């Protein structure tokens, strides 16, 4: 069976409002954390499907659609909200194996709510970014188009591209900073 294409009947604004309602003053840090989780997952799924090695745009589109579905459906379960980082902000985290057996029934239910929130955010972000991601990946394959402008993913840094530049859910200081001043080493 072919999986259904990722389509959303809700928007990023809807998800932001949902996070604000559920998580109040922690909504911003959890939106950023959820975006980083989605970016990490899409990077893994695109890599697993050899997206950069696809021969033509239709093949790349098909692989990207599969990767988006699997990136979101494959989010960790359970997924918990933990305090940590800067100023005690909250973030999503997969519990360690040793912590799994100590989760209470209430904590397990909370973890399912957290996973549903992260899943919805993932679907909205990646469905919205799908065509822009394709453009970036195709441009990356064309030697004369490898000059990167603001908003493009360098070296497959989907975290910075998706979370800080495109969706603007994270500050630049909150995402991986491996694409700065790295243009000299490109082929």
Regions from the language model: what does each represent?
Residues 3-187:
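Extracellular/luminal segments of secreted precursors and ectodomains of membrane proteins
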């Amino acid at each position: 069976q072919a999986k259904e294409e990722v389509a959303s009947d809700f928007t990023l604004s809807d998800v932001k409002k949902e996070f604000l309602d559920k998580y109040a003053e922690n909504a911003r840090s959890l939106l950023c954390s959820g975006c980083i989780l989605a970016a990490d997952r899409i990077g893994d799924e695109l890599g697993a499907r050899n997206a950069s090695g696809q021969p033509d745009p239709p093949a790349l589109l098909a692989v990207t659609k599969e990767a988006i579905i699997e990136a979101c459906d494959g989010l960790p379960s359970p997924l918990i909200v933990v305090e940590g980082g800067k100023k005690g902000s909250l973030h999503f985290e997969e519990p360690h194996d040793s912590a799994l057996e100590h989760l209470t029934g209430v904590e397990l239910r909370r973890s399912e709510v957290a996973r549903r929130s992260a899943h919805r955010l993932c679907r909205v972000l990646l469905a919205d970014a799908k065509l822009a991601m394709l453009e970036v990946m195709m441009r990356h394959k064309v030697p004369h188009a490898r000059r990167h402008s603001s908003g493009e993913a360098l070296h497959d840094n989907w975290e910075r591209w998706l979370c800080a530049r495109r969706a603007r859910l994270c500050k630049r200081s909150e995402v991986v900073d491996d694409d700065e001043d790295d243009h000299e080493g490109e082929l």
